[in-house]
Amino acid sequence: NLFREDDGDYSIYATGHGDLPEALRESGLLRRFLADRGGGYVWMTNLDNLGATVDPAMLGWMAENEAPLMVEVVDKVGTDRGGVPVRWNDKRIIAEEFRLPLSLDANAIRVFNTNTFLCDAARLENLIFDFTFVEVEKQVQGRKAVQFERLLGEITVGIEPVFMRVPREGVASRFLPVKDNDELARRRPEIEAIARAR
């Protein structure tokens, strides 16, 4: 059954960020970006990461080295969880911790994916890859709901990445996730300092 809100309407939720490559392709935006605007790179990040911006030095490095995909990673702090860089079938990929073998201690991997990607637009346009749907349990209006999401880190299976370790502290921070208004208010001085430094 589809989940319904208390008022009987179907519950609407944001899709997983893994829908973005297909949406850019299927909408024609990516094709027009390449053909009509001469676009070369697509920058993708989570909306809640207020530290992420397009960095000209990173973009220049990508162009000079003809790297198809750059994934930003940061040092883990506390209970950080998320996709981690690993080798799988002799390829570098981002693997979500729940997909790692039980014998592998995810805490031994000291960095994780910030969900900030810089990708060669032509490679993204030509990517033929079916992202996996992941079952995610959530609480909605006090009731258990299951939603299906696709995760952008899986793009690394289809496009070979380079991993860029970026700072998460101080005015150079590129990872500043803010999940709600209370956290936004609490971290406002830090956000303002980062914005002024850029």
Predicted regions and their residues:
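Catalytic core of tubulin tyrosine ligase-like
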Residues: 30-46, 51-55, 60-198
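Conserved N-terminal catalytic core of the sugar/cofactor nucleotidyltransferase
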Residues: 1-39
